[in-house]
Amino acid sequence: MGRRRQGPAQPASELPARNACLLPNGSAWLPGWAEPDGNGSAGPQDEQLEPAHISPAIPVIITAVYSVVFVVGLVGNSLVMFVIIRYTKMKTATNIYIFNLALADALVTTTMPFQSTVYLMNSWPFGDVLCKIVISIDYYNMFTSIFTLTMMSVDRYIAVCHPVKALDFRTPLKAKIINICIWLLSSSVGISAIILGGTKVREDVDIIECSLQFPDDDYSWWDLFMKICVFVFAFVIPVLIIIVCYTLMILRLKSVRLLSGSREKDRNLRRITRLVLVVVAVFIICWTPIHIFILVEALGSTSHSTAALSSYYFCIALGYTNSSLNPILYAFLDENFKRCFRDFCFPIKMRMERQSTSRVRNTVQDPAYMRNVDGVNKPV
């Protein structure tokens, strides 16, 4: 998705050096590079980024961020999926959606080493097949994540505002079916990314780029079309649905003191609703900047200053950072996840604590006995 600038191609002597920060694509968010036409110009649709404006420190900083995202995101999301599979009590409708979100996040974190390498090497060294896979995973994550969060919000809305209907709708089986539908729907974009994604050798600057390969004649049209589709279907419409759901939920929670007839169930309902709200809010905070940046760039209103270009790449990094935040949110905000995480990470300690608690409970429940002179046990 490129931000390109019209103008004549640079002479070979003025082309950026091999160690200039070109940042060729390896992500659905990074721009491709314009291919000069036969007359040596960039063509009417080609606005090319100024590589010289990008500080060489940016790849190093972003690589460090991606390394943390890779470790925390892959381990954390894998642990979330394991906990939901391992413990029967965790197989609730909400947690089935959380599993889907963790799967999408875990997949996208596996692309971090490839993208970090691209930042450091200024070229895509992994070949055409991996290029297609990485870009496809990016688009799958983009759509499955926001679709899953939207369904989680709808699920919460039904649980809070329509508790009777929730008995039929909010089941683990139906949540699994909805997750499958989300992946099938996202495949319309993910498979397109596999088909269109590919590598292109840029001999003029000695790099290999990995990006969506649109027809050269209609590049600007297809580029703009893809950006608008992503902005509308992977951001605007889902966020509007989420806002409507939570607005109705807040009104309902304010108007009713007790939702379920039981204080304990009511506390759990509000706790889970709060967890989903925080996860959704963090997602929107992390992804809004890059979506806005892409939209403004598509309309040709972006600046080419160092600050603007630096902000652009850090907005991309912020979006990927979200994939490592969700497991941390679950650990802090949900007691069931926290308990299961502790049980997995410290099994011996948790087993000893349970045994100690069990002994204390038995001591309290069982009365002490004392043998009298007749040899009969009597409670003390």
Curated annotation (Swiss-Prot):
Gene Ontology cellular-component annotations: membrane; neuron projection; plasma membrane
Compartments in which it is found: Cell membrane
Primary localization: membrane
Disulfide cross-links: 131-210
Residues annotated as glycosylated: 25, 39
Membrane-spanning intervals of the chain: 58-85, 96-119, 133-154, 174-196, 223-247, 275-296, 312-333
Keyword Signal assigned: no
UniProt record similarity statement: Belongs to the G-protein coupled receptor 1 family.
Subunit structure: Interacts with NHERF1. Interacts with GABARAPL1.
Protein name, entry field: Kappa-type opioid receptor
Organism of origin: Cavia porcellus (Guinea pig)
Taxonomy of the source species: Eukaryota, Metazoa, Chordata, Craniata, Vertebrata
Gene: OPRK1
